[in-house]
Amino acid sequence: MRLLPFLFILYITNYLDRTSLAYAAIGMSRDVGFSDRVLGLGSGIFFISYVALQIPGALLVERWSARRMISATMIAWGSLTALTALVHTPSQLYLARFVLGAAEAGFFPGVIVYLSHWFIKEDRAKATSNFMAAIPLSFVLGSPIAGWILGHKWFAVEGWRWLFVLEGMPAIVLGAVAFFVLTDWPREAAWLAPKQRQWITQKLEEEKPGGPQAITVGQILRSRTVVLLGATAFLDYFAAYVMIFWLPTILKRQSGLSDMRVGLLGAIPYVVAFIAMLINGWHSDRNGERRWHSAVPVFIAAISLLGLIRLPGSTPLTVVLLSTACVITAFLPAFWAIPTEVLSESAAAATVGMVNAVGSVAGFAGPYAFGYLHARTGSFSYGFAMIAVFALAAGFLVLLTPGVRERAPAKPLAP
């Protein structure tokens, strides 16, 4: 109860900071003349440094200190988000976003590895789902918060500048608090009873895959497990990021409702995704099964996306299908439990970084490809078909990954 609620709050803060540009873009285009191309490149350039530093960030948590790493990254990204309020030129925006990506790179893979330091395998997917449920909830909360801030102009300063400042400062404060709240290992937790520390440490030691711990990048890239996980993450993230960035526009075009009503309707799919993620993570732990709990939400989303192709224009039906499509995010808890269970500690840390890096590339590619198809065809149907195929492929690939019972205990990487 001490760690998960706090990590949950940290991840909400992370996503609010990461997506602040999406809400600030309207004001930036008006006040400093940034074109859609500039804003699009500014958004995408974030992922260049973010992807490049995924593996080093994850390994720092394993080999240095999760507490120090998480604290430092939060203070850094909070400061950089706040400083983005000072941009006046495209080059300043590009620099701010590039450095922000570098600052955030180690947080997510670091937390996934950190959870494996604390939670035994039968609790790991539930812990991951409780942490990652912050993603849909951040979108539920972020839109009204950003809208309220953008509507104000305190001390003659534009609302979009205040948005960066006010969403960056909580990360700085929470980063400092994290240094004192988090503990690297159960054996170091003075707030646990001695018997609790001993029990958790012993259970985690018993679950460790055996064999050598040192690994190389070459071993990672040659591992069938890592290749499958990376391909699955790319395909799933491709579809998921399309839903994240295009959902408001899809609702607006399909319904013709006001922006305010679209904003309220847009929260419904993320509420559904939030509930689905918690239930799927809980059920995965209860049954000790990961692959099907990763695949089924993706298959459900694919069916919903195919339904959107034949959509007759009904707003309620649109919301229902988009809600079930957003269930694709329920794939995450069981999926991220796989590398921490079938690989050794150092292999899992490097793999989480590598897989998340590959998946994050889709954060730029997915929304861009979907927008390109819409611009060329004038219809969302081709984009829905594309991401439905990607989602189906992700579901089938994750079923090919080795299960916990299939791992080779003498090897740091599954073959």
Task: Mark where each language-model region is.
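Extracytoplasmic
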Residues: 2-36, 142, 243-248
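Conserved MFS/SLC helix-loop-helix module at the cytosolic interface between two early adjacent transmembrane helices
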Residues: 52-91
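Extracytoplasmic gate region of multi-pass secondary transporters
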Residues: 21-22, 218-278, 332, 336
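Cytoplasmic helix-loop-helix junction between adjacent transmembrane helices
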Residues: 96-133
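Cytoplasmic membrane-interface "Motif A"-like loop-to-helix N-cap segments
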Residues: 63-74, 285-298
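C-terminal transmembrane helical hairpin of 12-TM major facilitator-type secondary transporters
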Residues: 290-338
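Glycine-rich segments within core transmembrane alpha-helices of 12-TM secondary carriers
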Residues: 126-147, 170-171, 356-366
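Helix-breaking motifs and short loop linkers at transmembrane-helix boundaries and internal kinks
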Residues: 33, 65, 86-92, 103, ...
